[in-house]
Amino acid sequence: MIFATLEHILTHISFSIISIVIPTHLMTSVYEIVGLCDLSEKGMIATFFCITGLLVTRWIYSGHVPLSDLYESLMFLSWSFSFIHIVPYFRNYKNYFSTITAPSAILTQGFATSGLLTKMHQSAILVPALQSRWLMMHVSMMLLSYAALLCGSLLSITLLVITFRRNIDIIGKTNHLLISSFSFDEIQYLNVSFRNYHRYQLTQRLDHWSYRVIGLGFTLLTIGILSGAVWANEAWGSYWNWDPKETWAFITWTVFAIYSHTRTNKSLQGANSAIVASIGFLIIWICYFGVNLLGRGLHSYGSFTLNI
């Protein structure tokens, strides 16, 4: 009872903190207030430790790693987003993930604590299929890979939006320059060039970090799939069964393998590889969440009960 109460308290504290962090971060993005920026980063650190405490508490009183159902996997996914958020802070890097990770963490945690998953808030005994030492290895790797791939894909989507807007601005400004006076043309040209240079720098940085994060996520996804294959062989006598979850995991892996190939090809870098990553964003959600709603297979343990 004490552990359940502590888990409940930590859930509400983490959700409340991150609810304050998001508008604070938006204010710092607009007004560049250093104090508020530092406050929002510390808020995400506090959120990370609250969710960590929540998962550890649930682990202690349930007797098994908290990765057995959709509620627990969503809380772990929220923890993963928080972890990705605070890594640049401790390594003194400019945080390009902040506008992505904080909303992602609150949305996943918000859905996890919603009325749809109320029955799963109380920990239950593991079903026989999940009573394996491979549970922690396989599911944690898959969820960490989802978090990394989602963040990298969102950076790629941001890159596409900036590139698309830049192209529109260039076309609009070019047409305007053709009908303007010569002296005004020079001023406009310098302004457009200056803005485009900074946008170019931003897109290059987004492309760089997107590639690094997706590369990490792809590695974790590969480890997760391989460990799942070993577990499947122990549980069902076959390394691969082509059930809906496994099929979509393979599709996800293939999409990001294609991304890795396009990203290493100089002629396909930038917008082309970002389009592939954007497609991957949708594929991940189908693999993680949609398959259990639309399909049945060895990984489906009833509606809203398991998603690994």
Curated annotation (Swiss-Prot):
Keywords: Chloroplast, Cytochrome c-type biogenesis, Membrane, Plastid, Thylakoid, Transmembrane, Transmembrane helix. One of its GO terms (cellular component) is plasma membrane. The chain crosses the membrane at residues 15-37, 43-63, 70-90, 97-117, 142-162, 213-233, 246-260, 274-294. Its main location: plastid. Required during biogenesis of c-type cytochromes (cytochrome c6 and cytochrome f) at the step of heme attachment. Belongs to the CcmF/CycK/Ccl1/NrfE/CcsA family. This is Cytochrome c biogenesis protein CcsA. It comes from Nuphar advena. The lineage of its organism: Eukaryota, Viridiplantae, Streptophyta, Embryophyta, Tracheophyta.
